[in-house]
Amino acid sequence: MSSECLLPYYTAHSYRSMGVFNTSMGNLQRQLYKGGEYDIFKYAPMFESDFIQISKKGEVIDVHNRVRMVTVCIASTSPVLPLPDVMLLARPAKVCEEHARRARFIKGRGYKPSKTLELTRLLPLKFVKISIHDHEKQQLRLKLATGRTFYLQLCPSSDAREDLFCYWEKLVYLLRPPVNSCISNPSIPTADTSTETKSTLVSEIHGEGDRDSKFQTSQDVSEATSAAFAGGERTQPNIAAILTTGLAKARAAGAAAGTGAAGTAGTAGAAGATGAAGATGAAGSARAAGGAGSARAAGATGSARAAGATGSARAAGATGSARAAGGNTAAAVMTPLAGLARAGTPTSPVSGVISIAATTSKSPGSGQVATGLTGTASKDQERSESSKAMAVVANITTESVDVVLAGAASFTSESPSAEGDAYGSPDTGLNVAFAGSITTKGPAEDKPEAPLVSTLQSEGYMCERDGSQKVSHTSSETQKEKRERRESDRKGSRKSSHHQRTGASRHSSSKDKGRKTSSYRSVSGHGKTREDKKEKGRGSLRDQRHSSSYRSESRTGHKSRKNRPAASGGFVSKRATKIRSFFRAFLVRPTLKTENTSGERGGVDIVTKLVEKQDIETTVEKSKDLEFSDTMASESMEKIILETKPI
């Protein structure tokens, strides 16, 4: 026996499938051995046969009325490998066919020329699924990772073995063992069957019609091809990485959704007109870790407090953060105009978590509304589990009612697994917790509001109790003297009404001139001619003081100033305007101090004439926006500080 015939026995002597590969050398193997074009296959164990291409129904596919012959060869790139890893496809060369026709025409029909094959395909077996299509007709089915399927029928030569197809059946079960043998004891795989189990999983992954994974297999094909051309020195690539090729999906390592509702409490107490209500809201968090991504949301805390007859609402929290890993995207939206903040993130379509947190705060009309919301939702399609959690805090404040509401709700659903009972019902759970309080505000007691300085100026009069509050530091002796004089002068006030008008007209004609010279006259004194003239003026001022005290008493008795006689309206308005401008000096500048003046003559003089008219008007203009928020106590006190001089 020649060395060529001993070659397969030599290379397959220690091979695991030596029963299949202990055959004579075929045409393709002989051509590769002699040609030396592919050194990697020169001493490689091979098992080859000739096939013709057919359709799924078993019909012969002919191209240009010719049968398509295909030589299928299963080989191993290295004798170290436990299983073959490469499939070679070859066809008769065109040049060889033309040469055979010419030789047959020259030498006759009995001449049988040597057959030359052309190597067309080199496919790693991990991307090819070989199965038995029809045992009786000796047909095989080849399904590639690209999704294409070919049907081949064995066409042995005349000198081939009769049980050649049985060897192909053994080889198919060697490359792809039955599913029962893999599932029988999957926890303890042997060294020989571990690769077979992996090959089975690979073949199951690349099912019929899986055309979406074409672009993913190119890298693995190049890697396997380079490993094959390396002479078998490199080991077989990791099958764990192969299992992921052909599937365009990511599996999450775990998804856990936890919901918590803590601190839903409401307290309401009434002490007088005071009520307090508190509610602290709920938090939900969900986390998912793995290749799909992760999302976290925590927050949504709201609090509301109400004290006394007035209510104040506060809402804090509603912060959301979303984090994504593994190519996922996160989005956050802020709308400051509407007072709404939202944040959320999506994850993978297989199993993921979606979380959102939002808060709103607005004041429609006289009321206030503050709400806080957070929620999470997770779903695992593989385990058929889903969970939802939501927490809400709301506070509504109006003029009469304060409403505080806080609550949390969680929903979980779990469908029965495929291994369990097929008629089982899904397990669902719902937890709801709410707490709220309502505080009703009673009508506030009517509080007297003090008039504004600007209002008093427009109305044309000055309230006595305001002036009494500003100049309330007068001595008790002065008050007693004023009361005695008021009682004594009240009787003669009516008789001297005509004299009062005359003195008032005289005093109004002098205007600022008499006001400026009065202070100078009271301090230093001038000639007797001026003193005689002003003596009458002092008498008129004394009568003016009596009439003003009478008018103040009438106003204290709630009599309207507009109901006075129209005949004396002109004189009274002028005199009231002067006294009003004088009193405003005490309201705006309460720190004014009255100085005691001395003179040789006796009588009553107005000491506050030291304040000029320009200063009074400027001070009043600056005090137009002044508002008295406190309650004014009504006291009957004189606004004019008088000083009695010895005669």
UniProtKB/Swiss-Prot annotation:
**Can the keyword Phosphoprotein be found in this entry's annotation?**
yes
Q: Where is this motif: Bipartite nuclear localization signal?
A: 494-511
Q: Which residues carry this modification: Phosphoserine?
A: S378, S634, S636
Q: Where in the cell is it found?
A: Golgi apparatus; Nucleus, Cajal body
The residue ranges flagged as biased composition, category Polar residues, are 188-202, 361-378
Chain intervals with Basic residues compositional bias: 492-501
Which BP terms does GO give this entry? acrosome assembly; cell morphogenesis; gene expression; single fertilization; vacuole organization
> Where is the segment annotated Disordered?
188-220, 267-296, 361-384, 465-573
Q: What function is annotated for this protein?
A: May be involved in RNA biogenesis.
State how it assembles: Interacts (via N-terminus) with RAB2B (in GTP-bound form). Interacts with FRG1.
Q: Which PANTHER family match?
A: GOLGI-ASSOCIATED RAB2 INTERACTOR PROTEIN 3 (PTHR22574:SF2), PTHR22574
* Name by which UniProt lists this protein: Golgi-associated RAB2B interactor protein 3
Where is the organism placed in the taxonomic lineage, from the top?
Eukaryota, Metazoa, Chordata, Craniata, Vertebrata
In the UniProt record, the gene name given for this protein reads Garin3
